[in-house]
UniProtKB/Swiss-Prot annotation:
Similarity comment: family membership: Belongs to the prokaryotic/mitochondrial release factor family.
Coiled-coil residue windows: none
Main location: cytoplasm
Function: Peptide chain release factor 1 directs the termination of translation in response to the peptide chain termination codons UAG and UAA.
Gene Ontology MF annotations: translation release factor activity, codon specific
Gene designation per UniProt: prfA
SUPFAM superfamilies: Release factor
Localisation: Cytoplasm
Residues carrying N5-methylglutamine: 239
Protein name as it appears in the record: Peptide chain release factor 1
UniProt PTM: Methylated by PrmC. Methylation increases the termination efficiency of RF1.
Species, as recorded: Trichodesmium erythraeum (strain IMS101)
Length: 369
């Protein structure tokens, strides 16, 4: 069984794939490296689903043959049993291939291949919330290192008792946004703070925002909307005082976004960094507006919802992490050490299944082929 919409789409993709193959064999196209590369990339993006479709068609033919053998094997119990097993195996294979093809046909998020800025803000809980924000900075840094991604601290606001009031990490590598976009939301922790003498469990939160890297073309910023001031990076006194005003305090009047950037060595570099962060924040606002429109049709999007969405609770007493979107529990210690790949893969799978259900609900009645 395969849905009509799926077969129509697969036939169209296969036709496009074959046309691209012919164009790549054209000597005139080969003379234009830019055009050749563009066509090769387009063909490569279709290769997985086309190969799967070819395998599916072959399995359909094998299934028809096996059913014919089963039909003709009247009185031959051994042949009937062999044919029956083959039919069952092929039906299971076809079901698996259909699911693979559906997933391969799902629209890709255009931001999936982008680098990101990961912002962590301390939420409710006072000093403990800032310490918790610091723990999350460490967790994501460890995970990024495990993925062979490059991590750098773009901006920070240190808390008096340790940790961060706010921190922004820049993470660069392969498919960063495609994975970490599921981490956006409120992360709640339940534990006894180091500042708690009575041993009582406190609940604190930190908010994570995932902002895909953007350039000037994607986000327009009117310079009239920006107020810029400078300060010394080292603070009020001590050995680390920078006597030159290299720190940049940027304020975006329409949105109220304020960015204080001190990480770079020169005022110009800090200004560029602050503008880079502002572009990412404005782009994130635009994405959230788009997602709000989608959510009126679709109840929610896993992990890419609003910042107010509580996505996970970290319970120290029970050594348990509960992901509220998945309704699943995970061991606390490995996650805090950056081993969050299993959680992220579970979110990706859930997201795919939800989109497949929507696709099926909006499509035609299944037909037999």
């Amino acid at each position: 069984m395969a849905e009509t919409y799926l077969l129509d789409k697969l036939k169209s993709v296969e036709q496009t794939y074959n046309e691209l193959t012919l164009r790549l064999a054209d000597p005139d196209v080969a003379k234009d490296p830019s055009e050749f590369q563009k066509l090769a990339k387009a063909r490569s993006s279709l290769e997985e689903v086309v190969n799967c479709y070819v395998e599916w068609k072959n399995a359909q033919e094998e299934l028809a043959d096996a059913k014919e053998i089963l039909k003709e094997a009247v009185g031959d119990l051994e042949m009937q049993e062999m044919a029956k097993v083959e039919v069952e195996d092929l039906e299971a294979k076809l079901e698996s291939l259909e699911n693979q093809m559906k997933i391969a046909l799902l629209p890709r998020d255009p931001n999936d291949d982008k680098n990101i800025m990961l912002e962590i803000r301390a939420g409710t809980g006072g000093d403990e919330a800032s310490i918790w924000a610091g723990d999350l900075v460490r967790m994501y840094s460890r995970y990024s290192e495990n993925q062979s991604w490059k991590v750098s601290l773009l901006s920070e606001s240190l808390a008096d008792m340790g940790g961060f009031k706010e921190a922004i990490l820049e993470i660069k590598g392969d498919h960063v946004y495609s994975k970490l976009k599921f981490e956006a939301g409120v992360h709640r922790v339940q534990r006894v703070p180091v500042t708690e003498a009575g041993g009582r469990v406190h609940t604190s939160t930190a908010t994570v925002a995932i902002m895909p890297e953007v350039d000037d073309v994607e986000v327009e910023i009117d310079q009239k909307d920006i107020e810029l001031s400078t300060a010394r990076s080292g603070g009020a006194g001590g050995q680390n005082v920078n006597k030159v005003e290299t720190a940049v305090d940027l304020f975006h009047k329409p949105t109220g976004i304020r960015i204080f950037c001190t990480q770079e060595r020169s005022q110009l570099q800090n200004r560029e960094r602050a503008m880079q962060i502002l572009r990412a924040k404005l782009y994130e606002i635009k994405l959230q507006e788009q997602q709000a429109e989608v959510s009126s049709i679709r109840r929610s999007q896993v992990g890419t919802g609003s910042r107010s969405e509580k996505i996970r609770t970290y319970n120290y007493k029970d050594n348990r992490v509960t992901d509220h979107r998945l309704n699943q529990n995970f061991s606390l210690v490995p996650l805090l050490e950056g081993d969050i790949e299993n959680v992220i893969q579970a979110c990706i799978t859930q997201d795919q299944q939800e989109r497949l259900q929507e696709l099926a609900a909006s499509s035609s009645t299944p037909i037999s082929v």
